[in-house]
A protein has these predicted regions:
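Aromatic "clamp/platform" in nucleotide-sugar-dependent glycosyltransferases that forms part
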Residues: 246
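Short alpha-helical segment that forms part of, or immediately flanks, the ligand-binding pocket
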Residues: 232, 251-259, 273-274, 280
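Short hydrophobic beta-strand element within catalytic cores of glycosyltransferases
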Residues: 263-266
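A short, well-ordered alpha-helix in the C-terminal region of glycosyltransferases
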Residues: 297, 304-319, 325-331
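C-terminal alpha-helical cap of glycosyltransferases
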Residues: 3-13, 322-341
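Donor nucleotide-sugar binding/catalytic pocket of nucleotide-sugar-dependent glycosyltransferases
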Residues: 127-167, 180-188
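Conserved catalytic-core segment of nucleotide-activated headgroup transferases in glycan assembly
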Residues: 158-222
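Conserved acidic donor-binding segment of nucleotide-sugar-dependent glycosyltransferases
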Residues: 278-289, 297-303
Length: 341
């Protein structure tokens, strides 16, 4: 075996205990889970880019923010993690003209059906050395079925998002929970994202029902929970959680509600039918009249709601647990480090 061949084999199998990963602020809750891999994450920022929002999650201790437009050449980065084809992957390739590192491309979103073929083709070609998707459904929609890729499902912190004892006749001190039987939805910018979150459908489905909306909204429709603990409380006080998304691979709020043991009713879109078995761990349909009827049935039958909620939490424990998430990502990170020259 030549020295060059031995060097290649050695590099492909080696790994570090802790990697230095250059990345971008994207989804706070997802990146909080990602930080549990134990590596160091450094967020690159430029003018106009998204910044970490503390309302959605506390910044982990191993997640650092770099000064704007700085990559600190003194830091020994191991690879770049891009989490979007809409700006981040382009920035990654631009930065890489200097750093020359492997790029891991994670895509959370789906291509919009109305895109012209040329636009889809251009975005489809914006790839990394390793391409990761959050569901098999996403792989198909992006046209990667026959190409090398990785799939890592979301994870939920089930020790935080869990059933808690609540007195639905009394609000905990210092909180603003809704006490009466009600339907909860957690969505940011609901109205302005009607095209994918389906606010108009939500209005029709929940007409004449008691509801509570949580989430940042520039129109003043709702406010975010003032803490993660408050959000967990909101999930536990809700009688039913309603998700009306039409164009989202898998809404994080839906998984969190299930983890809290809340009975869920949802549209049957994207990856959701792979998670929710109708009548077993929730209800799904794309018929608004059916969705409303399912909600009303659960409001009248708290025992049924409790049973579906318990089954929903079990689904999260089995399919969206932290151990699998962390192990899958560490395998990808080891693979990326093996590509470093």
């Amino acid at each position: 075996m030549s020295n060059q061949t031995a060097s290649i084999i050695s590099k492909s199998t080696c790994k570090k205990k802790t990697y230095n990963i250059l990345t971008f602020d994207t989804h706070e809750r997802y990146q909080t889970q990602l930080a549990k891999t134990g590596h160091n994450f450094y967020a690159f920022r430029s003018d106009g880019c998204k910044e970490w929002n503390q309302d959605y999650g506390k910044q982990p201790e191993n997640y650092y923010t770099l000064p704007k437009n700085s990559i600190y050449h003194g830091l020994d980065f191991d690879f770049i993690l891009s989490q979007s084809k809409f700006g981040q992957i382009q920035a990654s390739h631009q930065i890489n003209q200097v750093l020359k590192l492997p790029i891991v491309s994670l895509e959370h979103t789906l291509p919009i059906p109305s895109w012209p073929d040329e636009q889809f083709s251009q975005l489809r070609q914006m790839t990394g050395d390793i391409n990761v998707f959050i569901s098999k459904y996403s792989v198909g929609r992006w046209g990667f079925t026959g190409e090398s890729h990785e799939v890592v499902h979301h994870s939920v912190d089930t020790s935080l998002f869990k059933p808690i004892e609540v007195d639905k006749m009394k609000a905990p001190e210092g909180t603003c929970v809704t006490l009466n039987d009600h339907v909860l939805s957690v969505v940011n910018d609901f109205k302005s994202r009607d095209y994918c979150c389906n606010y108009s459908g939500w209005e029709r489905i929940t007409k004449d029902l008691n509801t509570k909306l949580v989430g940042s909204c520039s129109e003043g429709l709702s406010k975010p929970a003032h803490s993660i603990e408050q959000l967990v409380t909101d999930y536990n006080y809700a009688s039913v959680f309603l998700n009306t998304s039409t164009f989202s691979p898998i809404p994080t709020s839906l998984l969190e509600a299930m983890s809290c043991g809340c009975a869920v009713v949802s549209t049957a879109t994207c990856m959701i039918p792979e998670i929710i078995e109708d009548g077993v761990n929730g209800y799904i349909s794309n018929d608004e009249a059916v969705l409303k009827s399912q909600i009303q049935n659960l409001l009248k039958n708290p025992g049924l709601a409790k049973e579906l909620g318990e089954n929903a939490r079990q689904t999260i424990l089995e399919k969206f647990n932290e151990d699998s998430f962390v192990n899958n990502w560490n395998n990808i990170f080891n693979k990326a480090y093996g590509l470093k020259k």
